[in-house]
Amino acid sequence: MKRILLFVLLVAACSAAFAQSTAGFGSISGVVRDASGAVIPGAKVAVSNESKGIVRNLITNDAGLFTAPALVPAQGYAVTVDAEGFTRYEAKSLELLVGQDLNLNIGLSVAAATVQVEVTTATPIVEETKTDVSQVIGEQQIAELPINGRRVDSFVLLTPAVTNDGTYGNLSFRGMAASNAFLVDGVDTTQQFFNENAGRTRIASQLSQDAVQEFQVVSSNPTAEYGRASGGIVNTVTRSGGNDVHGSGYWFFRNRTLNAQDRYATFNPPEVRHQAGFSIGGPVKKDKLFYFFNGEIQRRNFPIASSINRPAVIDPSGHFIGCGAPATPAQCAAIDRLLPRYFGAIPRNANQELLFGKLDWRPTERHSFSASFNFLHFLSMNGIQTSAAINTGAAIGSNGNASVRVRNGRLSWTSIPSNTVVNEFRFGWFTDRQADDFNPDVQTAGLGYVVLSVAGQSYLGAGASYLPRVNPNERRFQFADNLSWTLGKHAMKFGVDIASSRDYIYNMSERHGSYVYGNVTAFAQDFSDNAAGGKRWQSYRQTLGTPDVTLTIRDHGFYAQDQYRVTPRLTLNYGVRYEYAALPQPAITNPDYPQTGRIASGKRNFAPRLGIAFSINGKTLVRAGYGLYHARYSGVLLQSLFTNNAVYQSQVSLTSSNYAAGPVFPNRLEASNLARGGTTVEFAAPDLRTPYTQQGTLALERQLAANLGLTVSYLWNRGVQGLGVRDLNIGPLGPVVTYRIADAGGNIVGAYASPTYLLANRVDRRYTRILQVENGVNSYYNALAVQMRKRYSKGFQASVAYTWAHAIDYKQGTYQDNLGF
C-alpha cells in the first residue's frame, strides 16, 4: 500500500498530470485516415478559434491520432488537416462544450480529387469517447429558457437522476444530497462546512446568469480527475471576452400582480423585485488580451404572511386564551400586547450585489493566462425564514437578519511545451461568510433574547435560538496542476490537487436561555412579576461554554488516468485517485472519555475507476462504467465533535422552577455547577473511515437523426461507510410490559408486549447519552433514465428526460441530519 502511494506521489510531483479534458476546459481529438481506412501519420493539424485568438498546431502520431487538450469552451472552432498527396480537410463552426472530448473521424481524399472537404458543423451528437454520465447546459439554453429569480444553477434539474432534496433546494444526485462538488472554471467553490454550493440556497444566485457561459453536470462515473465528491459534480464555465466587443444591459421586474397567491397564505402579500445589470466583453489587444465584466443588483421586498394558528392558546384576533386568577387583569393585558406583532405582514427584504471580472492573456501560441474574480454580497432583513406564509409564529420567534458574503478568485496558466504535452496550473481563493443576527425592529421590552414557549405554543421569543451566529466564515486556498500527454493511442493524465479550508464558527443554541411555561396564567405572572423574583416556569434550558471554534481541513488529492483508443470503435478510460484529508484535533477534551481528543483521518482512500465506450456502427454507442468516489469531511461533523464533549459546551436542563439557582424570567444563568446527568458526550470511533460510494452505469445511446439522439441508462449507486451515531449509554432493558390495544369503541382487540428502558439502567449515569460517530450507514440506489435530445437547428432545441428510481437507505443526508440516529 505504501509503495503504491509513493509511486503516485512521485509521478504526480514529476509530471503533475496527463489529461483529456481538464475541469473547466474541453478537448478536440481525432484520427486521420485515407479512403481505404488506413491511418495517416505525420499529417499537419491546425485547431483554431479566431474570436478567442487560439491556434494549436499539431502532427498526427503513428496511429494517425491528434489531441488538443485544455481548450477554452466556445463556439467557432475550426480544424484543418493537411497531408502530402491528399486534399485539405477543413471543419468550421465547431462548438466545444465544457468537459467534452470532441472527437472527429477525418477521411482524406487523394490529391487528384480537387474538391476541398468542408464541414460547417461536425459536432457529433453521439460522443464516441465519453464514458461518464453527464450533460452540458449550453449557452443558448441559459440565455433563452425561463428561470425563476435568474438562479442559474436551477438548470441542473434538467439533468436525469438529479432532483431537489428537502425544502431548501439542495441538489440530490442518485439519492445523494450531501457530497456534491461545485466548480467554477475548474476551481472548487463548494462550501465545505455544509457540503453545499457557495452561499447555499438563501442567496439569489452565486454567479450572475449573464456571467455564465455553460456548465457540465456529471451525475455518475466521472474520471479520476474529479474528487472530494461521492455525489455529483457541477462544472461551471464563465464567459470570456473575444476579438469582438459585445455588451448587454437588462432589467427584470416582478410584483404582487404578477404573482399567484401562496396556497397556505390567507392573503397575497405584496412583493416588489428588481433585478438589473450589464455585461461587456472584448479585446484589450487583438488576439492577445481580452476582458469580460458583469455587474448585477437585486432589490426585493417580500413581506411574510404571518399568523399563529393554535386555537387552544391564541384566538384569531391575537389574544391569549385562558389567562386568569391568580394572574391579575393587568398582567393578562400585559402579555396580550406581545401578540399583535405575530399577525399580518412582517417586513422582509433580500438585497444582493454581484460583480464578476475576467482577463485572458495569450502572449504566444504556447502560453495563456487567465484571472477572474467574483464578488457577492447578500443582506436580508428577517430573511432566515424564506417561506411566503408562516402560521406558527416563527416569522418572528425563529427568524432574524441574514447576510452572506462570498468572494472567490482564480489564476491559471496553460503552457504547451510540445505538440503532445500541455500543462495547466491553477490557483484558487475562496471565502464564504454567513452571519445571522437579531432584528432590533421586532424586539419587545421585557422579553430580551430568550426562547419562549407558552402552553405548547413555541416561537414566542425575539428570534432564532442560535442568534447571533457566524455559521461559518470559510476560507480556502487551492493549488492544482494538470499535465496532458498524448502518446500513441493513449491520452494520459496525472494530477495533484491540494486545498486548505479554514472554518470559523460562532454558534451556540439557547445560550440566552429557553423558558417553557405550562399555562398562560403562569407566564402572565412571571412576565409582570420578574422584579419580585417570580419563578413559575415549567422547565428551563441553557447552553453554557464557548460559542466559537476554528477548524482547518487540509485535503490532498492525486490521480492518474488514461484514455486508450484500443480500436477506432473501442475506448477505455481507466485511472485511480488517492485522497487524504488531514483533520484538526480537539484541543479541549473530556477527561472521562479520552476518545474526545482524537478524530481519525481515513487513509485507505484509493479509488479505481473504469469506463468503456464501444461504437457499434457510428450511430449506436454502448457505455459502461464503475468506480469508487470518496466524500469530503464536513465542518458540521467536526464542529459537533469539538463542542459536544460536555466540556467545551454543556447544557443545563432544569425540569422544575424549585431549583434555588434557577433564573428569574427573562434572565439567564451566568455560571452553573453543571450536573452531568443531564448532558451528552460525543466522540468519533477510533477506526473512523472516509465514506464513499460505488457507482456503476450501463448506457445505450443512439443517433436517430442528424440532430436527434436517444439515451437509455441504468444507474447504480451503493453508499458505503456512511456516518451515523450510536448511543453507547443504553443499558440492559427492564421488565416486559404488556399494553392492551383498543378499537375506536373502547373494545380490547389485542395486546402488545415490549421491554422497558429505564434511565436508571444507563451504563454511565453521569451522562444522559454517550454518542459515538461511526461508519454504520449504507444505501442503495437503482435508476432507469431515458433522455431524448434535439440539438439546436432550424430555430428549435428540446430535451425530454424521465427517471425512474428506487432508493433504500438507513438515512441519507448530511451528518447534521443524522444526529437523530
Language-model segments: which ranges?
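Cleavable N-terminal targeting peptides that direct proteins into the secretory/outer-membrane pathway or into
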Residues: 1-22
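Short acidic-glycine motifs
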Residues: 21-41, 46, 50-821
